[in-house]
């Protein structure tokens, strides 16, 4: 497995764990890569992965801890459409049986993933609820779109 920066599989590493323990860890790492749809890239150095796939790898390393709560800070920022869709699907997939607290400004991503949306303005709670309700809230529209004439849609 070559997801460690620029090291290759045949590069010597010195570990304090036994070889058998390392094989167990390799097997778990491969499971995690498969879970985030990166198994086909296991032999590539992480530096060669696209930005979106690097973010998926970050999610895999978080999943290794089997968290009940995951914090994601703008997970799709700076991504192209294809990577955004891939990460959106991945977040939806890994959200089963865990809580995900996500800061995200891409309303398309938010609307397709979130059960509950909390909108803050200058640190104060502006609105909270399902996307359909929050996106029609006049205060939210005014704060983020500048007018209460239209519904909050699209990406920020």
Q: How would you describe each model-predicted region?
A:
Residues 1-156:
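Glycine-rich phosphate-binding loops of nucleotide-dependent enzymes
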């Amino acid at each position: 497995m070559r997801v460690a920066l620029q090291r290759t599989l045949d590069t010597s590493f010195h570990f304090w764990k036994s070889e058998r323990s390392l094989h167990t860890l390799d097997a778990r790492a491969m499971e995690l890569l498969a879970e985030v749809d990166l198994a086909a890239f296991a032999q590539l150095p992480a530096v060669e992965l696209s930005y979106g796939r690097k973010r998926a790898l970050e999610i895999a390393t978080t999943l290794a801890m089997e968290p009940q709560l995951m914090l994601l800070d703008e997970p799709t920022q700076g991504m192209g459409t294809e990577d955004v869709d891939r990460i959106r699907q991945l977040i939806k997939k890994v959200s089963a049986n865990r809580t995900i607290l996500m800061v995200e400004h891409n309303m398309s991503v938010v609307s397709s993933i979130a059960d509950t949306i909390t909108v803050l303005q200058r640190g104060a709670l502006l609105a909270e609820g399902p996307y359909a309700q929050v996106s029609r809230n006049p205060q939210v529209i005014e704060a983020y779109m500048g007018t209460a004439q239209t519904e909050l849609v699209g990406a920020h």
